[in-house]
Amino acid sequence: MKSYIYVHTVSADKVESHGLVWQARKELHKAVRKVLAASARVLRSPFADTFSTVDIEDHDCAVWLLLRKSREDSKAARLEAVRELSEAHHWHDYQYRIIAQACDPRTLIGLARSKESDRRFFLPPPPLPSLKEDSSTEEELRHLLASLPQTEIDECLQYFTSLALSESSQSLAAQKGGLWCFGGNGLPYAESFGEVPSATVEMFCLEAVVKHSEIPSHCDHIEAGGGLQLLQRLYQLYKDCPKVQRNIMRIIGNMALNEHLHPAIVRSGWVSIMAEALKSYHIMEASHAARTLANLDRETVCEKYQDGVYVLHPQCRTSQPIKADVLFIHGLMGAAFKTWRQHDSKRALTENVVVDENRYTTCWPKTWLAKDCPALRIISVEYDTSLSDWRARCPMERKSIAFRSNELLSKLRAAGVGDRPVIWISHSMGGLLVKKMLLEASRKPELSALINNTRGMIFYSVPHHGSRLAEYSVNIRYLLFPSLEVKELSKDSPALKKLQDDFVEFAKDKNFQVLNFVETQPTFIGRMIKLHIVPVESADLGIGDLIPVDVNHLDICKPKTKDAFLYQRTLQFICETLARDLKN
């Protein structure tokens, strides 16, 4: 047990200076008596008669008692200690600092994931090492990237890494493919396809490190190369660039999947950074932090949230029992958050907007659904649509619905999806992925729980029978979908027809509940072309209600208000389908 004494300096007039030494000695002796008394009570050890306990305060003793309780062998006692610590809001600063300096990583992470924890529990990150002479963050990032293994990685990552290491800012900006749209904004990106991205080498290198961090062995190399400190330097440097900060948090979240790296992550101060980010009003920032902290919290979380899997609710430790899961799967060139924003075209594409939850939300599943159904775990997933823009540089199988569905299925199982009742909610091509995932799971005995626990699904403008998009020119098709996806979406696609036939038979056999929404308005493609991407006949699964809505393809999953029909009908379906499970 360590004890800490904090001495605060005060100014003194020269006239009073003669008694300063005596006064300081008196205060130090008083502090020592209090610390020894508190320690004696906590440790239940004999207390020397030469020290007095007259000055000890009850709340000082409580600090040490809670600290000891947080290290008990009993998990229930440890959890109770963290809960009590998180509810302490009227201590003196030094008492929070005692906990901050003396608690173990398990307690610190628990406090970071506790909604009401005082920020004074979290010490600032340790000072960063100085940059090498004549070096820069760009050069350090290049050096880190170059130190990562370049063998046994796929063609896409090889190509991306080599570009980041060899090209200049100007030549990188001239690469006008999809290289700059990891988790991009979909059709709005297509509208600006002719514009040159304003990006830097640092950002480009960072994108490559994100992809490397998905490989567990590469995370070890990132840590060994000082990556945790370098990423923290970049995080501080780009405080006003949310995209850079989110990519950095993606890397830390991926590294946190490896439990042997947890001590290094904690020592480098990332828990304090994530604790602050978790309280952010920016939903994306808070969700990235929540994923990282959940991966660090092995005390209460057994699931692991891999890259692209985000828990929207609950993001903190909670006593509320979770009885079912609701999953949100975006469409091709969509995103885990912006696809599910409230309809508001003027606000929607603002990168750094902070909004009043009662007036506007950048992610309605987190803001509205979590409040209406607190017993749900709400997950939104993101798959890497930008890979499909790397033209012939990437293996073709990475672009197929089959490949994407298997990859997502593996990630969702790691997150514990299938262990409790599930409803799947999808937009556009995301619905095809849901169908393919469930069919694949039905063929694997080890995934039988996922099938048995699937209660139903909601499809927002899913092209079950193909899309008219495939009828248009090659240039337009390329802007929206890569060639393989276009072929799979065409009305005469054998793969799409087989997927539809197999799923309908399977869904009827399992008696899944289904709700279909479909757009009735065309969508602007670029600046001059309007296209009805998923017509009514294509969105008809053949099972469940089919509801036409007077919106376009992008807005079919974006309710205008919480009282709007789109949201209320969605909420009604969820509550009715899970009624029995939520009552248990």
What do the predicted segments below correspond to?
Residues L332-V422:
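Active-site catalytic motif of lipid deacylating hydrolases and related acyltransferases
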Residues T520-N552:
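Active-site-adjacent alpha-helix of alpha/beta-hydrolase-fold enzymes
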Residues M1-L332, N406, R413, G418, ...:
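Long amphipathic alpha-helical tracts in eukaryotic proteins
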Residues N453-R455, D509-V514, L541-G544:
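Short, proline-enriched alpha-helix->beta-strand connector loops that line the catalytic pocket
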Residues K558-C575:
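Post-His helix in hydrolase/transferase enzymes
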Residues A224-G225, R267, K338-D344, R391-P395, ...:
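Short coil/turn segments at secondary-structure boundaries
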Residues G331-G334, Y383-S388, M429-G431, L439, ...:
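Conserved beta-strand elements of beta-rich interaction domains across eukaryotes
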Residues H330, D344-S345, S388, R398, ...:
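Serine-dependent carboxylesterase/thioesterase catalytic core
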